[in-house]
Amino acid sequence: MEPKKIVPLLRPHPPVVGKVTHHSIELYWDLEKREKRQGPQEQWLRFSIEEEDPKMHNYGVIYTGYATKHVVEGLEPRTLYRFRLKVTSPSGEYEYSPVVSVATTREPISSEHFHRAVNVNDEDLLLRILEGGHVMVDVPNKFGFTALMVAAQKGYTRLVKILISNGTDVNLKNGSGKDSLMLACYAGHLDVVKYLRKHGASWDARDLGGCTALHWAADGGHCPVIDWMIKDGCEVDVVDTGSGWTPLMRVSAVTGSQKVASLLIEAGADVNVRDKDGKTPLMVAVLNNHEQLVQLLLDKGADATVKNEFGKGVLEMARVFDRQNVLSLLEERKKKMPRKSSVH
């Protein structure tokens, strides 16, 4: 039998470029003109794909084997890459192909880009994304917030206007039931609050805890917002459906802000309102050791003699919870109160 004729290794063609994305490039090499593979793998031609390092201008191997296709992954968008094919014969002889240059594509617009534009207050990018029609305007981020919620919370009034003009739903809620109006009220962004109200946001919406926008505004402590809300028709003694607390009760429990309490009381808030457990704002302020608020509530007519549904009054609460300053204040106030004449 005649020995197999050894075909000299010719310089291969550069890899053929297949599918290109923003993070991958497909390369394959044409073997149609070569003899069909026969015998054990060690007698086949071996292929290597090498990628150029643009800084060092040398090449590194990113694939080696007997396949005729390779997908290069983990690439950067809109970046030029240079590759060459190395073909090695069983005898160790090798040849390099000419270099092929390929650029990855632009990264497709996603909801992440959309939310990133809102987060950093990038008006131009937001407009480009919306004009391109690549994303739904109400798509939530990973925390369940729509773009409008984020813009409202951060006080980005221009972005709020852009999003509303592009059809966003002002009454959508996040996972805890808060809408954009509640978030803007809590953060104190009056311009955003006014604009949301103008475009259909409701004072009557409640979160999962039963709180309204005024409850959240009271927590936030921004008096200009609270003042405008009340003038716009907010019910000053609106009760949450969880604890039965009014905004004044929230102040007594959370911040102890005298300014917010004064504003609510001046607007007609009931200083002796009771929650589901029979507690008054004064009792809650005592329990939370808000000394100055206790003083204010007493000055505004809070009744220090009432008991909750368990028969406990503010003096007993102050003693049990060791609220010494508040206790002194209450006892001093009690001394000054006129004694009631006994009725026979």
Curated annotation (Swiss-Prot):
Q: Which CDD domains match?
A: FN3
Question: What does the entry note on its domains?
Answer: The fibronectin type-III domain mediates interaction with COPS5 and RYBP.
Name of the protein in question:
Fibronectin type 3 and ankyrin repeat domains 1 protein
Q: According to its UniProt record, where is this protein located?
A: Nucleus; Cytoplasm, Cytosol; Cytoplasm, Cytoskeleton, Cilium basal body; Cell projection, Cilium
Identify the InterPro entries for this entry.
Ankyrin_rpt (IPR002110), Ankyrin_rpt-contain_sf (IPR036770), FN3_dom (IPR003961), FN3_sf (IPR036116), Ig-like_fold (IPR013783)
Domain of life here? Answer: Eukaryota
- Which SMART domains does the record match to this protein? ANK
What is its quaternary makeup? Interacts with COPS5; regulates the phosphorylation of JUN and the transcriptional activity of AP-1. Interacts with RYBP; may prevent the ubiquitin-mediated proteasomal degradation of FANK1.
The gene that this protein is the product of is Fank1
Supply the Gene3D superfamilies for this chain.
Answer: Ankyrin repeat-containing domain, Immunoglobulins
Residue ranges of ANK repeats: 109-139, 143-172, 176-205, 209-238, 243-273, 277-306
> Could you tell me the Gene Ontology terms of the biological process aspect for this record?
negative regulation of apoptotic process; positive regulation of apoptotic process; positive regulation of DNA-binding transcription factor activity; positive regulation of DNA-templated transcription
Q: What are the residue boundaries of the Fibronectin type-III domain, all occurrences included?
A: 11-108
Q: Its principal location?
A: nucleus
Instruction: Quote the cellular component terms of the Gene Ontology held in the record.
Output: chromatin; ciliary basal body; ciliary base; cilium; cytoplasm; cytosol; nucleus
Keyword tags: ANK repeat, Cell projection, Cytoplasm, Cytoskeleton, Nucleus, Repeat, Ubl conjugation
Supply the source organism's classification.
Eukaryota, Metazoa, Chordata, Craniata, Vertebrata
Quote the function comment for this protein: Through the activation of JUN and AP-1-mediated transcription, may regulate apoptosis.
Q: Can you summarize the PTM annotation of this record? A: Polyubiquitinated. Polyubiquitination leads to proteasomal degradation.
